[in-house]
Design a protein with these regions (language model features):
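Conserved interdomain linker/interface between the two RecA-like ATPase lobes of SF2 helicase motors
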Residues: 42-143, 183
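A short beta-strand element within the Helicase C-terminal
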Residues: 7-10, 208-232, 244, 259-264
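C-terminal accessory/interaction regions of large nucleic acid-associated machines
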Residues: 306-340, 359-605
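C-terminal helicase module of SF1/SF2 nucleic-acid helicases/translocases
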Residues: 257-350
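Conserved C-terminal RecA-like helicase domain
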Residues: 1-2, 112-208, 223, 232-244
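Conserved segment of the helicase C-terminal RecA-like domain
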Residues: 42-43, 221, 232-281
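Structural recognition of the conserved hydrophobic beta-strand(s) that form the central parallel beta-sheet
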Residues: 11-12, 43-50, 208-211
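SF2 helicase catalytic motif II
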Residues: 2-39
């Protein structure tokens, strides 16, 4: 936060994310809005959300009295909704929340690939498949299907495919799929590749887009047809608001009058009767939501109380959500000057949960970290922050501070220190938790990432590591095989795992700990706390020119590309921390149209 900045307007798009149950991201979003409002009490607050019958819930959440609410039930295009049960050869369409059978079509389509290929042939199609593993297997299966039909490759996509091979790896399966007008899309893809896929889907170079729920995360990508092959989002069933948000991608304004939504059951467990009733036959205009921290289950309230009292999450499902919520309650009880006006405190007080507030206040008696640091780091357990704060005082600044040009050995040493003082193995929870034994691996990735290595270089090094150490690759069905660099499935799995580690474990989890560590160093040792590695991670470089280019709006990959290919055009004034770009027209002219960097450079130079 910066006290010199006054915010007059706050716009919250996709506001339904504040209501996602057992999702810590909803709590982080709430906290960011609430803190911004506390610093800017006169700011005007705007929410937008699809398919919601009680939009006033967002104003109530933040105690906004006399707020105006507008609700529309009109869609941009008409939509036709179908349910196709291939296991029982039943085809139906939805009319007034009822399934109406369609006769004489069950012999036309024998597989889901028949449906995807033949229905609305020649029109754009989004195929929702659930998780990443399903997305990849469905893409592979469809690619085999169209090859058997002797479908031709699309020459206009050859350049796109070569860019994917250059940016990621020659064996990455996405490249071959794109040559046939097919692509997959999920959160672990590099943003540059996602942008490339979305752009080429919009202009018609990509016809079939297999995806996860990433398309629910604010990506505006409509299509003529949307195929929904499962009622689940990850391991959980869709909430109606998510289902209709995804279905709303069907129909392209100003291109056609209607869009089609096909919910297809071709495997057991993808669509059961309950999902059909709660989703397909639900009224999208009558969806009511409640904020994620409104706990209506007495068991969950008791579990929250247990975590606050004991600090233990043992035996609790979705414990990371309740742990984060418990810390938010504890922090808010510290904010004594604001406590009477804080929505979180008011909610528990008004619902008769004063015991929770009592235990929360009692649990922070010995916490002496400044409130502003606790508020900025709710994703790190308070007890973990407290332990680190106390441990740091036992070291000298020379033992703690981080260097500006770290070696792999220094990174390993400092990561081990951070793991120990934060007790990360104790407080890090979940399937994707950090692990002390993986520090050598984290250090290798961190070293390359912070020194500006490209993704393809990092991937190539990972492949060499797997080969030289005769490592196994873990596949989607929980089996493992000796890694084979000539197996495109192995390459794709390794690429996706590496990108996930860069973005999640390095770029989010470790960055959060390192950022907090640097905040504590600045607090305890006021002079020269050393380099801030969290900035190196955020920018993916320790080069100030690459930083400055990203400040201008360029992505990491594009900033590194410009630094590498046009160094004479980039003049950095170190004294004033200012970057000057010379001969912009020449740079634009030398970057080939439709290249990975072309759109960015044309827009920003």
């Amino acid at each position: 936060t910066c006290p010199d900045i006054i915010i007059d307007y706050i716009f919250v798009d996709e506001a339904q994310k504040l209501t996602i149950k057992n999702d810590t991201r909803s709590l982080v979003t709430y906290s960011a809005i609430e803190q911004t409002l506390n610093l800017n009490p006169n700011a005007k607050l705007f929410f937008s959300s699809p398919n919601l019958s009680n939009p006033e819930v967002f104003n109530d959440l933040f105690n906004r009295d006399h707020a105006k609410v507008y609700r529309s039930i009109e869609g941009a295009t008409a939509q036709n909704l179908y349910f196709i049960d291939l296991l029982n050869n039943k085809f139906s369409y939805v009319d007034k929340n009822k399934l109406i059978d369609i006769d004489n079509v069950n012999q036309t389509y024998t597989s889901v690939n028949d449906l995807i290929f033949q229905i609305n042939k020649g029109k754009s199609k989004i195929i929702y498949t659930g998780g990443i593993d399903n997305t990849l297997s469905r893409t592979r299966d469809f690619l085999r299907y169209i090859k058997k039909l002797q479908s031709n490759k699309k020459p206009q996509n050859f350049d796109l495919a070569s860019q994917v091979r250059e940016f990621v790896h020659t064996g990455y399966e996405l490249a071959e799929a794109i040559e046939y007008g097919v692509a997959f899309h999920f959160g672990n893809l590099p943003q540059a590749i996602r942008d490339l896929i979305e752009y080429n889907f919009k202009i018609g170079n990509i016809d079939y887009l297999f995806c996860t729920s990433t398309l629910l995360e604010g990506v505006n990508l409509p299509a003529r047809s949307v195929f929904i092959l499962t009622s689940k989002k990850g391991t959980r069933y869709f909430e109606p608001v998510d289902f209709w948000n995804l279905a709303g991608r069907a129909g392209r304004l100003a291109i056609e009058l209607a869009g089609d939504i096909f919910c297809v059951k071709d495997e057991s467990g993808t669509w059961n009767d309950k999902a059909v009733k709660n989703l397909i036959l639900s009224n999208k205009n009558e969806i009511e939501l409640t904020p994620s921290f409104y706990l209506n289950d007495s068991k969950r309230i008791k579990e929250l109380e247990q975590i606050i009292k004991t600090g233990s999450t043992e035996g609790i499902q979705n414990s990371e959500f309740l742990r984060t919520l418990s810390d938010m309650v504890r922090i808010d009880t510290l904010r004594t000057d604001k406590a009477n006006n804080l929505p979180l405190i008011n909610y528990f007080r008004n619902n008769g949960n004063n015991d929770i507030l009592h235990y929360a206040l009692k649990s922070i008696d010995n916490i002496n970290i400044p409130t502003h640091i606790l508020l900025a780091n709710s994703h790190i357990a308070i007890n973990s922050q407290h332990n680190a704060f106390n441990c740091i005082r036992n070291y000298s600044i020379d033992e703690l501070k981080l260097s500006w040009n770290p070696t792999n050995e220094e990174i390993k040493e400092k990561l081990a220190l951070i793991f120990n003082i934060y007790q990360i193995d104790k407080y890090s929870k979940g399937l994707n938790r950090l692990n002390f034994n993986s520090i050598p691996y984290y250090a290798v990735i961190l070293t390359k990432w912070m020194h500006g290595n490209t993704l393809s270089e990092i991937i190539s090094d990972a492949i060499v590591y797997y080969i030289s150490n005769r490592k196994n690759i873990y596949l989607s069905d929980k089996t493992q095989e000796p890694f084979d660099q000539n197996n495109s499935i192995h390459i794709t799995k390794l690429v996706n795992d590496t990108i996930k580690d860069i973005e999640l474990k390095i770029g989010y989890q470790l960055q959060n700990y390192i950022s907090h560590y640097c905040q504590l160093l600045s607090l305890v040792f006021e002079n020269n706390p050393g380099a801030n590695w969290s900035q190196f991670i955020e920018f993916g470089s320790n080069d100030p020119i690459v930083w400055q280019l990203q400040f201008m709006g360029f992505s990491r990959h594009c900033a590194i590309f410009l630094k590498k290919n046009f160094p004479k055009h980039l003049k950095y004034d170190q004294e004033n921390n200012q970057l000057y770009i010379l001969n912009r027209a020449e740079i634009k002219s030398k970057v080939k149209q439709n290249k990975l960097y072309w759109l960015e450079i044309q827009a920003l130079l």
